[in-house]
């Protein structure tokens, strides 16, 4: 369906691999499972590739693991088959030796942020030690020469020379481009906000929620760890919400003490772009954020204010600015679906 978006080099490189195997986190067992589900959807529906979703407790004997593109996560790859003819994209590649000791190609998937310090990551892209190649306006590639960007606890406090690669990328909405429906802008709204997401520490969230409640708007939360929703249920609840804001967590005092203000849980500081705001826009809602970094990334396509009372008031005005919402939908449709992300992985393969 979307193979026409690939260059001849990208088509040739992609065709060398017979299948895509996503490994780990069966659906609803972890919030990362929704990302895994989208890799399956993008490569199977979007590019017509044979796909399999396997995990440590589901290892069939009739799947050929040779010449495959594996996509996994460093905490879910204990029993993953490591095959010389395949390539491995690993988010949180906390044990690169697992792959490199078997002489396979390893490409780590990292958050597309300039700086992050946590139990997995320890890097700052503008410190003079990183040499990046732009894959798209939304993704970068780097040839790594050591494990220095891993947190010291993951490398035994020792920096070792290693030959692997990484891609810095965002996540995306769960709609593929052909699934966007501009009539969704007109879905009838309820006098409620259905806020679906993991509980987190946020200064702005309660202020905005209180502004809604003071104005007679019901605030309803749903925790995916306790009550997983299907993609369609999530979409419908977000579409029915009178507003669809997103609030980034700030991390805990302990996180700051251990890793500094640019710790991985402090999304307001590191500039993490969440899928929630991209989903909201793709579903026909006004994009709303409390993150200046998200504003810088999405520009005119998202509403931002540092004062939550102001953000609430402007959101209530702009929520019926249908030309603005449509323009934002078009932007996300062309830039932030898993078709875009899949193409970025393929471009990394071409490096």
Task: Explain the meaning of each model-derived region.
Residues 1-133, 140-144, 158-160, 214-222, ...:
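N-terminal pre-catalytic "stem/leader" segment of glycosyltransferase-like enzymes
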Residues 14-15, 124-126, 186-189, 237-239, ...:
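Extracellular/periplasmic catalytic domains that process cell-envelope and extracellular macromolecules
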Residues 20-28, 33-47, 51-56, 222-351:
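Catalytic binding pocket for nucleotide-activated donors in carbohydrate/polymer assembly enzymes
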Residues 22, 181-202:
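Conserved donor-binding/catalytic core segment of Leloir-type glycosyltransferases
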Residues 34, 200-210:
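A conserved mid-protein helix/loop that constitutes part of the nucleotide-sugar donor-binding site
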Residues 94-97, 175-180, 229-233:
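Alpha-helical scaffolding within the catalytic cores
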Residues 112-114, 137-138, 156-182, 199:
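Short beta-strand->alpha-helix junction loop in the catalytic core
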């Amino acid at each position: 369906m979307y193979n026409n978006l690939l260059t001849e080099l990208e088509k040739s490189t992609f065709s060398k691999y017979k299948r895509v195997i996503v490994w780990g986190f069966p659906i609803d067992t972890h919030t990362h499972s929704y990302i895994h589900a989208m890799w399956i959807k993008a490569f199977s529906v979007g590019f017509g590739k044979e796909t399999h979703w396997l995990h440590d407790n589901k290892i069939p004997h009739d799947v050929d693991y040779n010449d495959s593109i594996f996509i996994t996560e460093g905490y879910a790859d204990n029993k993953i088959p490591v095959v010389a003819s395949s390539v491995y994209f690993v988010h949180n590649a906390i044990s690169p030796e697992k792959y490199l000791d078997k002489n396979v190609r390893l490409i780590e998937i990292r958050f597309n942020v300039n700086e992050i310090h946590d139990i997995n990551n320890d890097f700052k892209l503008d410190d003079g030690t990183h040499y990046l190649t732009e894959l798209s306006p939304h993704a970068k590639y780097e040839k790594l020469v050591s494990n220095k960007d891993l947190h010291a606890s993951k490398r035994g406090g020792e920096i070792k020379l290693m030959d692997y690669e990484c891609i810095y990328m965002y996540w995306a909405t769960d709609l593929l481009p052909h699934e966007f429906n501009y009539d969704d802008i007109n879905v009838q709204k309820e006098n409620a906000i259905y806020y679906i997401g993991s509980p987190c520490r946020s200064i702005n969230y309660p202020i905005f929620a209180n502004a809604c409640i003071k104005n007679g708007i019901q605030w309803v939360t749903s925790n995916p760890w306790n009550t997983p929703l299907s993609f369609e249920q999530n979409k419908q609840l977000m579409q029915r919400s009178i507003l669809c804001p997103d609030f980034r967590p700030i991390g805990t005092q302990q996180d700051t003490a251990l890793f500094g203000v640019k710790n991985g849980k402090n999304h307001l500081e590191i500039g993490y772009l969440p899928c929630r705001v991209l989903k909201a826009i793709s579903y026909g809602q006004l994009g709303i954020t409390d993150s200046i970094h998200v504003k810088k990334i999405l520009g005119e396509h998202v509403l931002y204010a540092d004062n939550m009372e102001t953000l609430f008031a402007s959101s209530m005005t702009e929520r019926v600015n249908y030309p603005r919402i449509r323009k934002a939908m078009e932007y996300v449709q062309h830039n932030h679906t898993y078709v875009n992300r899949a193409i970025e992985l393929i471009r990394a393969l071409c490096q």
